[in-house]
Amino acid sequence: MSSPAVGKSLPKPISISQVRQLLDQPAKLNTPEARRDKAMLELLYASGMRISELVSLNLGDVDTGGGYVRCFGKGHKERMIPIYERAARTVKEYIEEVRPKLAHKNDEVALFLNPRGERLTRQGFWQKLKEYVKSAGLNSQISPHTLRHSFATHMLSGGADLRSVQELLGHANISTTQIYTHLTTEHVRRTYEKSHPRAK
């Protein structure tokens, strides 16, 4: 398997425990915006979507009963992504209990809304994420894309095949997805050196 190109920086995922720590932050604030943010963070990590895809979602793009989200990636290419039950439930609760409090117009189709009842922007979500990263005491370099990197790395570490992860991420070329195999190989190497009696 080919190595990442020279000079190409590797994505920096965070650990599963750090993801959990981050996703737990909005629950500490009992506000409509915090409950929206919880749904967005869960969905981002559940799906591996790009932040631009997340904020572009409309109400009809999420099937919380079936556990799927439909998004449109680069080149307006559609893909259906399964999401875990907790994420589906969190989004369902947001749609039923929180979104009506944020929506000012009945004809607004955007899934995630700001306090003015308009579609939340990438910048708006990024600003909220920075606040949660800070309150969780995590690395300030964490961005929305970090959760996408973490999704891919954790899926491969958990046994997912490269082609499936490629489809979930919406990569046109598998070589783009292969960069994550380097990260999982590095993890295996560190585990080996830490665990093997003759490697210590």
Language model segments and positions:
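Conserved catalytic core of the tyrosine transesterase superfamily
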Residues: M1-K200
